[in-house]
Amino acid sequence: METREGSLTWSVLKCDLHPWIKEAIKSLGYPTMTPVQASTIPLFSGNKDVVVEAVTGSGKTLAFVIPVLQKLSNRLYNIDEEGENPEPVKKGHMLSIILSPTRELAKQIQTVFDKVLEYIPEDKATIKTQLLVGSLSSVREDIDYFLTNKTHILIATPGRLLDFLSSNYVKTNSVEIAVLDEADKLLDISFERDVIKILKQLPKQRRTGLFSATISSAGDTIFRTGMANPVKIVVKSKNSKNAAPTSLNVSYMHVEPETKISALIALIKDYRFQKCIVYFPTCTSVKHFYSVFQTLVNVEEEDRYKFFSLHGQLSTKPRLKTLQNFSEGDSMLHKHVLLTTDVAARGIDIPDVDLVIQLDPPTDPDVFFHRSGRTGRANKVGQAIVMLNNNSREEDYVNFMEVKGMTMSNMECPNISKIHDKFQKKFRKYMLEDRARHELAIKSYVGFVRYYSKHMASSIFRLQTLDYVGLGKMYGLLRLPKMPESRYIPNEEMPEDGWLGDVIDMDKYEYADKQKEESRKKNLEEDKARKVHDAKKRKELKVKNEAWSSKTDKIETKQERREKMKRKREAIEKQLMDDSSSDEETKVDWKEMVKTNKKKKTPSDSMQGSFDDL
C-alpha cells in the first residue's frame, strides 16, 4: 500500500475506535490524521501485521499507539457475547511490548502513551505502562514494580527487556501486540540477536508492527520477526523522488576543515531559530566542544545561548534529564543548542527544532535521514545542513544521497573572515590553560579518524584524502599525535615535528586541577629519576661489557701467543733434529778413523818411549 502526504479527518477512519480514545485524540489537539495514521490504524487495530515506512515527522508514533490502546481496550473493557466481563490479566503477564533502540526514544514513546491514557474514564480499569531501560533501576527492581503495579504495556530497549524476561516471574503468554519502532535499527547487527530472542518468546498469534523511515534497509531480516502475511505501508512525500518531507529543506555546505567550527559558530549566531541540534561524530568530540562553546561562545555573547550535551557515555538519568531540559526550556529567552551524537538521531520528537547541523556526514547513510528529520516535523518548516570537507571526494556524497532519495541544495558558507582568526587565538589560549583539554582534544581527533575510516561509502570518505593538519587545527591541537594515518600527510604539508603553532615545553604544560597536576609532577620526577637510574645502569652495563670484551681479547691474544710459541718450538726442535743427525754422522766418521789408525800401529811403536827425563 502506497500513499502520499496529506491530512484526513478522524471521522473517515475505517475503524471504530473506543469513545475514550476518540476523546483523547480530540483533546490532545489532533484534529486530522496524517496519511500514515489513516493507512495504518485500521489494519493494525484489526488482525493484520504491518510494515510501515514513512518519512520522519509523519506521525508514526501515534499510528501504533492508537492500535495498541484499541486492542488493549477490547481485551480489558469489552463484554463478550455471553454478557461476561473480560477475564482479568494474570499476575506476571503483560499485554503489549514496545521495543525501541534508544532510552530517549523509549521514554518519549511512554510519554505519548501516558498522555493518551490520562483520558481513560474513571469507571474503567487503568492501563499502565512501564519503562524498561538500563541504569534507571536494577532488573530486580523492575520486576518488583511490574508484579506490584500489574503493568500492561512494557516499553523497553532490547538488552534490558531480555534480562527482564529471563525471570521466572514474568510470563509472555498473554502478549497480544508487539511493536518495533525504528525497526531497521532494531534488526541490524547490533540488536538483531536480542530482538529475535525476544520475539521467539512471544505467542505466535500476536500482532506485530514494524515502523521506521528507512525500513527497507532491514532487508530479509523482517521475515524473521514471525509476522504472518504483513501488509507493507509506504508513505511518501508529495515529491516522490525526495525521501524528506516537503516542509524540510536539506542543504550541504563546503567548508575547510580548519574553519568548520568557526562556520558552525557563525550559523548559530546568524540563523534565526529557537532550538538547534548539532550532530558530532563521537562522544568525546561532544564533550570537547561542549566545554569550548560554554567557555568561549557564551562568555563572549553574554549567555545568549543555552548549550546542552547529550551522548552515549552519559548514564540514563542525566541523558533523560538533558533531553527534558532541552525540550521544555524557554527558547524565547535563550537560543537552545543541543550538541549530540546519533543517540538523538532516531525518533526523538522535540518541539520547535528549526535547525539541524551535521558537522560531518554519518557513517550510515540511513542515519542521515533520521538526523535531518529532527526538524521539519508535523508540517513545520525546518532546515537541515551537512558540512562537507573542501578539496576532497566528499562532494560526491551529494550525488550518493540523491540516489538514496535525499535531494540536497547547495548553501554558501557564511562569511567567517572576521571571526575565525579571533576565535583561533582564543581557542589556543583556552587549550593552553589546561593540559586536560588538550588530552580530550587528542582523543576527539583520533576518534574522528577512526569514525571516518568506518564510513559505508568508503569510496567517498577515504583516509588518503583527509586534511589531517586542518582537522588538527579544527580540534584545537597544539601538536599532531603520532598515528599510522599520518603517513597520508604530504611531506610539504607536514609541520616540523608535528607542531601546529609555537613549540611549547610539554613538561611545563600543567593541568588546571591542582591534585591532578601534583600527581603529574610527581610522575614526571619519578620518570626523570628512573631515566637517570636507567642511564647509570646502561653505563655500568657498558663498562661491564667492555671489561668482558677486554678479557676476551686477552684470552684470544694468549691463545695466539701459545700457538706462536708452539710453532717456534716445533721449528727449534726440527732444527735440533737436523743438527743431531749431522753430529751422528761426524761421530761415526771419527770412530772409523780412530779404528783405522789403531790398525796401522806396530808393536815396536807401542814399546818405544822417551828417556830424556831419566
UniProtKB/Swiss-Prot annotation:
Residues engaged in binding ATP: 54-61
EC class of the enzyme, as a word: hydrolase
Gene Ontology, cellular component aspect: 90S preribosome; nucleolus; nucleoplasm; preribosome, large subunit precursor
Region (Disordered): 514-614
Keywords: ATP-binding, Coiled coil, Helicase, Hydrolase, Nucleotide-binding, Nucleus, Ribosome biogenesis, RNA-binding, rRNA processing
UniProt EC number: 3.6.4.13
Subcellular location(s) per record: Nucleus, Nucleolus
Compositionally biased region (Basic residues): 530-541
Pfam families registered for this protein in UniProt: CTE_SPB4, CTT_SPB4, DEAD, Helicase_C
Record family assignment: Belongs to the DEAD box helicase family. DDX55/SPB4 subfamily.
Domain notes per entry: The Q motif is unique to and characteristic of the DEAD box family of RNA helicases and controls ATP binding and hydrolysis.
The protein's name in its UniProt record: ATP-dependent rRNA helicase SPB4
Organism: Debaryomyces hansenii (strain ATCC 36239 / CBS 767 / BCRC 21394 / JCM 1990 / NBRC 0083 / IGC 2968) (Yeast)
Lineage, opening ranks: Eukaryota, Fungi, Dikarya, Ascomycota, Saccharomycotina
